[in-house]
Every structure is written in structure tokens, then in C-alpha cells.
Amino acid sequence: MMSWAAARLTETAARCFRARCLGFRVGPWCVSQHENSSYGAAPHRTLRVSAVAFAGHNKWSKVRHIKGPKDMERSRIFSKLTLSIRLAVKEGGPNPENNSSLANILEVCRSKNMPKSTIESALKSEKNKGIYLLYEGRGPGGSSLLIEALSNSGPKCHLEIKYILNKNGGMMTEGARHFFDKKGVVVVGVEDREKKAVNLERALELAIEAGAEDVREAEDEEEEKNLFKFICDASSLHQVRKKLDSLGLCSVSCSLEFIPHSKVQLSEPELEQAVHLIQALSNHEDVIHVYDNIE
């Protein structure tokens, strides 16, 4: 049976969802917990509701995912997945039965139809001895960037990332990490196992039941499919995914990601410059992922 607190969250989240459908502006979260309540009410978990449209309808999402020829795009995705496999093997070994991070990545690889030979090559690669690097950067308009990389030469990678940043209106800086939280992210489709559509209101109810903190609408860059991202505490990632699966949702992947807790808005020229910068960083052979806090 749903608790009073959970029911209260569900009702409030639903009101926020209906308000957005009617065109009202909703803040970055709809439900919050008062830290110093004097009414003696039972404490309840905070559930944030991201007030954003699906990625395909968001200005930043439209410009940041400009894709080249399909073959080149698939090659880029496979290259980044190879880096992710190498990092997972480096941190937890080559056996997916004992390495949940690797198991999750291999699941994504199969969903992207990555060739088996490419996966096996990445698993056995001697380059798995590379160094994990996390660079902090400043982008156009005061935006913050985190650049994850895996390299066999830390100094060389550092110089090249610094050069790309400087060339495209950015710079290396300290402090960008403070704008992000490392969270668990479970990605699910917008249809359940019975092929019934799941709307945001229903996703919010399931998030409460599964123990997630946030629900965000997203889009698969390659297949242009709408998705939901359930965000949770890093330590509860696998429990949340298991619960969402048990509730009938179709999970696509789960991973740990850097999620911005404050965002910045950029002008049109700044957005264009940010696109070029992030694309240049993403094209570096050692870069796994580039995180930003652009609205």
C-alpha cells in the first residue's frame, strides 16, 4: 500500500504535469521537502520533476546532436562504447557476471548492434591498462564542462584537451565539478512491456514506487526515440532498475552519470560555439563522454 507521503508526492506531481500540459510555467522541480517543518508531518522523499520537453523539442538538444553521415555516426558511437568497455574492464575485470558496469555496457552494445568481434576485441585489448581522466572545463557563456577520458598517455591527452578547449572558446579550469552530482541513471522506453504508452504522469508515479529522485524526458540520439531517464542515488542504481523492470517498464540501460544541478542559458552565438566545442571534444579518440550544464 502506498504511504501517505508517497500519495502526496503523486498528487502534487500529477498537478504539475497537468499544469504543464495547459501551458503554465513550472519550475525546475515541483515537489520538495521542507527542511524545518513545524507541522509534525511525516517526512517524505524529494521527487524532482524536470520541466523540459522531449529532447527533440529543446533548442540545445536540437543543435548539440547534429549528426554526420549515418556510417560515421555509428562508427563514433562504437568508438565511445569501446572506450566504455575498456574502462569497465579496467575497474572491475572482464567477466560481466562479476562486473555489473561491464554487463550494462555490453547490453547497450548489443542494443546498438555493435559487431561481436568489436566487443570481443575491446574486452581483450591490452589498452585496458589506460588511465581514467576527468577534466574540468569552462565553455561559452560561463557553462561548465566535465570531460571523461581513458588514455594511455595522460600528459598528451591533457595537452590535446586543453588545446581543443582554448581553440573553441573554452578553457581548463577548476571548480566545474561542483556544478554536477554523480547519480545513477536508468533509461527506459516510453512503452511498457505490454506495448502501452507511458506518459510523464505515470512515469512519476513509478519513480516514487521505485525510489527514484527525478524523472527526465530524453531522446535516443541515433534512433530518435523518446525515452525516460529515472535518476537516483548512485548507491541504489541497480535496485531502482530492478524495481522499474518489475513494474512493467522496459529498461534500456543503467549507468552512473554526472548530472548538473544548476544550468545556464546561452545566447544563439554562444550555443553555436558550444556545439562546435563539444563536438570537437567528443571527436577526440580518448574522450568517453562530455557533460555540460547548458539549459
Curated annotation (Swiss-Prot):
GO cellular component entries: mitochondrion
GO molecular function: mitochondrial ribosome binding; mRNA binding; rRNA binding
Domain of life: Eukaryota
InterPro entries according to UniProt: Integrase-like_N (IPR017856), TACO1_YebC-like_2nd/3rd_dom (IPR048300), TACO1_YebC_N (IPR049083), Transcrip_reg_TACO1-like (IPR002876), Transcrip_reg_TACO1-like_dom3 (IPR026564), YebC-like (IPR029072)
Keyword Acetylation: yes
Function: Acts as a translational activator of mitochondrially-encoded cytochrome c oxidase 1.
Name of protein: Translational activator of cytochrome c oxidase 1
Species this chain originates from: Rattus norvegicus (Rat)
